[in-house]
Regions:
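Glycine-rich phosphate/dinucleotide-binding loop and adjoining beta-alpha-beta core of small-molecule
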Residues: 49-104
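Small-residue (G/A/S/T)-rich helix-start motifs and N-terminal tracts that mark the onset
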Residues: 1-73
Length: 104
C-alpha cells in the first residue's frame, strides 16, 4: 500500500487541513499519516482562532513518523510561521523526504 504524509493544520469542522487530506488519502487507497502544524477553530464560514504548535513538537511528530514508516509522498499545507517552515525543511532533508507537494 502506498503511504503519504500530510503536514498541515487541523480543521475542527473537517472540511480542510489534515482531516480533508486524510479523507482523500483513504478514499484513494493510500495509508495516510499526519504531522499537525496548528489547531484551528473554524467552520464553513471562517477561521476564528489558530493555535500554532511549537517547532519542537512538530519535529517530534516528524521523527516518530520517519523512524517507523517512510512516506512515499508528502503534502505540505498550512504552515503559519518561518520557524515551522525551517523545522519542516530540516527534517525533510534529514529523512530524505521525496515526492513533495506544496499546497498554498
Amino acid at each position: 500500500m502506498n503511504t503519504a504524509l500530510t503536514i498541515a493544520g487541523s480543521d475542527s469542522c473537517g472540511g480542510a487541513g489534515i482531516q480533508a487530506d486524510l479523507k482523500t488519502m483513504t478514499t484513494n487507497g493510500v495509508y495516510g499519516m499526519s504531522a499537525i502544524t496548528a489547531l484551528t477553530a473554524q467552520n464553513t464560514t471562517g477561521v476564528s482562532d489558530i493555535y500554532e504548535v511549537s517547532p519542537e513538537f512538530l519535529e517530534a511528530q516528524l521523527k516518530a513518523i520517519f523512524e517507523d514508516i517512510t512516506p512515499d509522498a508528502i503534502k505540505i499545507g498550512m504552515v503559519s510561521s518561518g520557524e515551522l517552515i525551517k523545522t519542516i525543511a530540516c527534517n525533510l532533508k534529514k529523512y530524505n523526504g521525496k515526492n513533495i507537494v506544496l499546497d498554498p
